């Protein structure tokens, strides 16, 4: 809010002053103080006149048009009238001797009401000079009053009475009030649901505390509104809106109340605007603003939303308090008086005047100030003081023009200075002016004057200095105009847009529109313009091709248009009205031709006028004389997109595509990174014929097909042909056809329609473009018609398609003719055509058509001719032509046809033929039935049942054997047919339960069946069979009971079954029962320990099984069964390892010694005496574990050591044999030799080779298994018995025991099994293990 001026005259100081704005125009301000003078100032603070009075001014008022100011003064009976038009003062005698106290002009007409201190009234008609004195209107001083729009006058006086009079002075209403009234006003109040435009409600402040409401039509129901005492006195109030009242209270409260029924007096807004006091409230309906003053400040509220504070003006220098506020009618100026006698005038609303030239703008910043700025290019703003308050502003490249009425002042724009050039007077009131670099064009009264701005600038011919448009003989009226760098363009009421080329000084173009052109807006280059016609429709006009394009969704309220000044967005423009900005884009090159699209709209803030559009930023001028930039919602993508949601990004993508901003769209697509967005961008590129960019997008998408297609067409120069291809790519085929036909390659339209299979269109095009293609198109069209069921037209097109010189094509057409002839009922023609045709498929298809038409004979003939024997036989069957069926049967593969034929032959009693046919049809039940019932061949029937597992067939065979009395076979086939109950009953009746039990035990049978058999055997006291079937049905207790009752002849098998039973039952009671039995607790006869071992294994009690296994092995070893002992220990070792249970060291040691013994035989047999000797030494060192073979083992040890050269070892064991307990048991064959060794000892011995420990690399003898270095037990090789080596490691793939890779391979050359697990093995199955660390880790654990 800018202060325009302040008035502070010495004569006013110390006392409050009165002032009054001129109504309507607000050009004058009348002010008076205590100096007996009314001074009249203009709106810029310059004194224009004054009225001298005989005493202090009582009151003053302007008439409704602002032409006459009426003033009354103390000590005078005259009314002073100042004429604003003539600047003259006249006096009017009131004709009454009373001192005047009140004066007011009417709202309608020129009536002046004057009241006196004695209550008399004078109504003066200024137009007719008629005076109407009314005596005694009030009994005391008239203090206030108000006119309404129907010329009713309401008056209030000190007599506590309100009267309502007409313009003749007649009283039509009067009402008493409780206290002295003040501030009377008329308004339209809504006290009920009636809507009336008449001002029929009177309001007044009564006693400064109460608001009185009085309805003229309901005089008996006045309303008194009282307020809180804390608010203080009512200072002033105003009606606003739809029946609302705004009230200011002396203690600073600002209130809004409603007068709507039934909420009369309800507070709808309250604010403590001022802390200490409030002195005035003023309302501007034009601005929709309310102002309050107090506490040295003015606060301005927006009436739309009272909570919004529009502005605050502080007056720190006013320390005596503020006075009265008042707006001009147009809301431009707000005046404030103060208690010390000063007056301040503020600019609250400027006329929104501005102009732009490229990126330079000029706009009004004060009543007498224009600012020129170029924010885009960073030029500092220049302020220009002007001589008059302008009504138009124009800016050019080098000049500024301002003016009013018929005069314009021109200024030259320098770098940082503005120089006044000249002023020009035109022949009429100027509506608008436009500037060129050299010329100005002023529009006034339907004419344009084009003239040089600076005459000395150009050495122009005289006729080029100025020119008036239109010519004298042209009767049109110019409504709008514009100047570009080259042209003067103007539009007329007859609808013609003229282009005047300034350089050649002549017209170069005109366009005729059906109705008048009222506004036009060229783009910065002048190559396009938007114009608005008298119907308020908008169009884009291109003078280059003289074409116009209607602007879609063009609002009739549009005030103006701005083109985008950003050089990269040439086709974008906005149209604006008071509320919205609509963004449009003119797309010159699209596959649909040039067109205008609406890109979106943006809300325009209140009282903003757009001046300049640059890259989506709209610079607007405001009422306050400032500029404000808003960003179009259609250009939201220009902001930061860092944390934008995908939904918003997709919306931005749509905006960029509408505005053809493909680079921005590319960036958004990269952020979205989804195929849909890239596809939208690619489609838009095709639409705008941006082929290179479309290729780039398609390549990014990986759309190889599109890239290849676009690469092929990108070099096409024919616009229509290229557009046609692109339209086709976007599936707009009708448009593509039109474009192709308009191009220099119209046959492309035919090719497209053929590719799309639009045969009807293709035929029409072929007649004109390629008649030789008609037969080929006819054939394709016929195929499509046939598919849709239009056989008549299909036949016609097939016939048209026959060329006579293209065999393959003609065959297709003839096939079509054959099929369509049959479908049309011409069977003979169609069938003959099909029979003559070489195609098998045609014969099949025609046969199918004939079969559907119930023409079986012809159908079968065609099928047979086409070698479709199954179909032919099927149709012959429908004809009952069995002879033909028989002929075709060897060629028929369909079981269904064989079945039909078989049934027919069976009915005829020809069973051998029938059975063959049934076999071909895979109908095994029927085959079995015929073999049993008719051909008496049960062997064949049984064979088929066993082969096919047919349940029904098995039943039939069972019945057959039952009739023969062969119950065993009958039971077998009953079980096979799942008839277990019948089989059981039959077995029971004929004492064949063993057979039934054997059969049922091999089948997947239910527990009930097993239980039935078990119960039967239980009754028969056949314990083993009873136990077996109780086990199968899960009754473990009963099964165990029967197994333990078995006689001794079945003892071994029964105990095995008992162990299996307990293993499955996992019942501790049953386990203990069986253990007692095995230990001999029940019968005093302990059973073999192997059964206990098997029991523990079945129960998965591996530790107990291991202890038992050691005992068994020991017994076997003692008995000399070393292989058995080895196998028992090995199996237990493997089971414990599988269960990840630690191997007992005793078991591992025993297994190692037994295995060493087994290796002796292998190595001795192969002649490797050293390996045999080493293993025998290990065995002999543990000879106590071989008690039954001590002497033979020691003898073998002596012999093998001797053979291997281990003389000292041979001597040691020979000496052992010489002990008395062994000496006599030595085999006579070796006795002398051994005695000789002892008598003549040879202690020489080959030293045993040393190899590294796999754990610590300590060198120790190769047969030593305990490392002295790391104290670890080293794994031994199952092929040699030596300790393992890290770099020569393998293992048996079956048992997982380690072996030396090189030695195991040598062993397997002579042996075919693993020496440990006895599984078959060959050397190719061995794999050398390079990293044996995991095996060593297992050994350590």
UniProtKB/Swiss-Prot annotation:
Biological processes per GO annotation: cell morphogenesis; cilium assembly; digestive system development; ear morphogenesis; embryonic camera-type eye development; embryonic cranial skeleton morphogenesis; embryonic limb morphogenesis; gonad development
InterPro entries: TPR-like_helical_dom_sf (IPR011990), TPR_IF140/IFT172/WDR19 (IPR056168), WD40/YVTN_repeat-like_dom_sf (IPR015943), WD40_rpt (IPR001680), WDR19/dyf-2 (IPR040379), WDR19_WD40_rpt (IPR039468), Znf_IFT121-like (IPR056170)
Record carries keyword Cytoplasm: yes
Principal localisation: other
UniProt keyword annotation of Cytoplasm present: yes
Tissues expressing the protein: Tissue-specific expression of isoforms. Expressed in the prostate, testis, epididymis, submaxillary and salivary glands. Expressed in ependymal cells lining brain ventricles (at protein level).
WD repeats: 11-51, 52-92, 95-134, 137-175, 273-311, 317-356
Mapped TPR repeat ranges: 736-769, 775-808, 840-873, 895-928, 951-984, 1020-1053
Pfam families: Beta-prop_WDR19_1st (PF23389), Beta-prop_WDR19_2nd (PF15911), TPR_IF140-IFT172 (PF24762), Zf_2nd_IFT121 (PF23145), Zf_IFT144_1st (PF23146)
GO (cellular component) term, any one: cytoskeleton
Keywords: Cell projection, Cilium, Cilium biogenesis/degradation, Cytoplasm, Cytoskeleton, Flagellum, Repeat, TPR repeat, WD repeat
Subcellular location(s) per record: Cell projection, Cilium; Cytoplasm, Cytoskeleton, Cilium basal body; Cell projection, Cilium, Photoreceptor outer segment; Cell projection, Cilium, Flagellum
Role description: As component of the IFT complex A (IFT-A), a complex required for retrograde ciliary transport and entry into cilia of G protein-coupled receptors (GPCRs), it is involved in cilia function and/or assembly. Essential for functional IFT-A assembly and ciliary entry of GPCRs. Associates with the BBSome complex to mediate ciliary transport.
Quaternary structure (record): Component of the IFT complex A (IFT-A) complex. IFT-A complex is divided into a core subcomplex composed of IFT122:IFT140:WDR19 which is associated with TULP3 and a peripheral subcomplex composed of IFT43:WDR35:TTC21B. Interacts (via C-terminal region) with IFT122 (via C-terminal region). Interacts with BBS1. Interacts with TTC25.
Stated name of the protein: WD repeat-containing protein 19
Gene name tied to this protein: Wdr19
